[in-house]
């Protein structure tokens, strides 16, 4: 819980300093920056300090359970007490789905998640709390957007776009009440399966969009291929290189977007 808000500022500072020190290196380099958030959403609402006062016994049992996990932290439940803005004022329409009409795995997984992870129970009738969960999720993204924006500005100031490949992606989403579910679960809804994947290379001076299906297993081959790796090097990895999609997909230049009415 709260590992994103605890560690992401440190990850950002180390990344920023590393880029400042190595931006002009003559030798090619590879840098992977992995922020934790928006993963903190998994622990809502037990990671909120107001919840501790409202449900002290539940919080106490959760804290004892978390203390058994050797994460190397002084406090495995430090708590989140920043203000959460109201980005949205309505729940998604599919929040009102009936889980009794869905596959049994939905209910079984939710029950197990609440029992063993103990993130805090949210009543179906407490729509205000479900909405707060979504706004918390969005706020975690906003916090990380600040770091990403600063890193991109640094890349621009150091004129790195001319010789640097940048890839942005994530591992999974969160239901946050969509289909009346929480967390990443064991289902194939768009909210957790449709991940952002942006690739920018020095050779691209226009935007391209593709609806082609890809997977995280394709990333290693794609990175090696973009870096000019040999076929022998590529054969060591599973998946497929996505470089073909950069040249063979739906193409939108600014003129084309205008013509399409975008």
Give names to the regions the model predicted.
Residues 202, 211-248:
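Non-catalytic, well-ordered alpha-helical segments in soluble enzyme domains
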Residues 1-27, 35:
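Active-site-proximal alpha/beta segments of enzymes that process anionic O-linked groups
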Residues 30, 179-182, 243-248:
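FAD-dinucleotide binding site
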Residues 30-33, 197-198, 223, 262:
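A short aromatic-rich beta-strand->coil structural motif
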Residues 252-262:
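Single conserved hydrophobic/aromatic residue that forms the stacking wall/gate
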Residues 24-25, 35-163, 167-170, 174-213, ...:
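Active-site-proximal cap/lid insertion segments
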């Amino acid at each position: 819980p709260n590992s994103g808000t605890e560690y992401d500022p440190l990850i950002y500072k180390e990344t920023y300093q590393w880029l400042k020190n190595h931006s002009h290196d003559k030798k090619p380099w590879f840098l992977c920056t992995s922020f934790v958030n928006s993963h903190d959403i998994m622990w809502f609402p037990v990671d909120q300090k107001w919840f501790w006062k409202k449900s002290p016994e539940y919080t106490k049992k959760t804290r004892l359970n978390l203390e058994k996990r050797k994460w190397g932290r002084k406090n495995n439940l430090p708590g989140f007490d920043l203000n959460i803005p109201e980005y949205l004022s309505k729940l998604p329409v599919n929040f009102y789905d009936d889980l009794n009409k869905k596959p049994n795995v939905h209910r079984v997984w939710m029950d197990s998640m609440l029992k063993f992870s103990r993130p805090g129970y949210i009543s179906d009738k407490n729509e205000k709390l479900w909405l707060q969960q979504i706004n918390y999720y969005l706020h975690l993204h906003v916090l990380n957007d600040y770091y990403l924006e600063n890193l991109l500005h640094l890349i621009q100031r150091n004129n790195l776009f001319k010789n640097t490949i940048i890839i942005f992606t994530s591992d999974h989403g969160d239901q946050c009440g969509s289909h009346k579910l929480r967390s990443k679960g064991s289902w194939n809804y768009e909210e957790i399966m449709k991940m952002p994947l942006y690739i920018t290379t020095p050779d691209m001076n226009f935007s391209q969009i593709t609806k082609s299906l890809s997977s995280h297993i394709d990333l290693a081959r794609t990175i090696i291929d973009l870096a000019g790796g040999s076929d022998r090097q590529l054969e060591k990895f599973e998946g497929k290189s996505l470089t073909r999609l950069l040249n063979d997909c739906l193409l939108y230049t600014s003129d084309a977007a205008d013509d399409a009415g975008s």
